[in-house]
Amino acid sequence: MKIGICSLGCKVNIYEAEFVANILKENNYEIVDFEDKADIYIINTCSVTNESDKKSRKMINRARKNNKDAIIIVMGCYSQLNADKIDADIILGNKDKSNIVKLIEEYKTKNNKITKIYDLTKTKFEEMEISKFTNHTRAFVKIQDGCNAFCSYCIIPYTRGRVRSKDKTSVIKEVTKLVNNGYKEIVLTGIHTGRYGIDINTTLEELLKELVEIPNIYRIRLSSIEINEITPGIIKLLKENKVMAKHLHIPLQSGSNKILNLMNRRYNKEEFKNMITKIKEIPNISLTTDLIVGFPNETEEDFKETLDTLNEIKFTKIHTFPYSRRNGTPAAAMENQVPPEVKKDRVHKIIKLSDKDEEEFYKSNIGKTYDGVVEVHPNGEVIVHTSNYIPVIVEDNLENNTIVNVKITSVDKKKVYGNLTNK
């Protein structure tokens, strides 16, 4: 049978969709493009914003249009919260994805709708392992699920449950397999990656110290980490161990202490900036961030404070989102919601700043030489991905997933160009 898979949202969803595809292939199902006519469609949904909900519904409807007789399977964050609103044959939340083959066979036998939604505050980490990724030069490893932070705007603790960590030995085993299968860059991902280990008596720092010692490992990248979870030991590893990618994605969310407090972010801008100063002692480090604008009660003065904070820090790139009101979160009930047109204007201002800072960072690297992983795009464009997250375009014909040295020669409108070198 042919199966089309669509995965929306974060890197954890990418990992889980890849895992599902792998076990289906192992059981003789054929994976086809989601837009093709298939016998089964799987939509791995996202619910981080209202826009994500809308896109999840859109893809469910598209699957029905592609083949009205197909089996429709909906899983993930949107279905965890909205199972009763979904027209599908099999509905899973954020558990039981590893049982996908069994559930499909059960549906084919009984032809009865299956809904599996669990209380995620009472579940353990669902073990998954991937040894090969489709169409990726980088390999993702999900080391953790769930979140205990309860930021006032965020629905994710309700869709993903509490922090649950993958056993450290299992992580090391999975990463070792991927390295032995030729993957040069391993991206550690999770819903709240920095809290890895709090439920199994270990830490992210301890895990990293063991992972960098795996034979032949080239690069480990952290997908995201909170500022108050960056330990002196992690900074030391980043500074001294070449296996650690010289890039961190650290969500700021706001540069105003008033707004950070309303968001329940557990740090102030001074603490954030102090830690950034320490991190910037790492040569050539690249720092990216997430930012929410138009949070309830955010005045022009608060927004200006955020702009000032961003100008002081100078991130390589700022991923900006207008605040999205999520029912069931404390922020949704707050007074002084910001009008959409104000949010839109603030988003544009942040994008403009981000574009400027990104280009400045790239230009500051002209003349520098880095080693990196080659990625050959379907259109033939060859990109070398450096440790500090610079995508360098080269004119050479290179083999995918190889390691080369590249000297950055020029930057044009955020496009970085370089030449191969023997260093």
Feature names for model-found ranges:
Residues 6, 189-191, 223-225, 251-253, ...:
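Generic beta-strand/beta-sheet core signal
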Residues 322-336:
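Aromatic/acidic polysaccharide-binding cleft in carbohydrate-active enzymes
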Residues 1-194, 233, 244, 248, ...:
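Proteins enriched for Cys/Gly/acidic motifs involved in redox and nucleic-acid/cofactor modification
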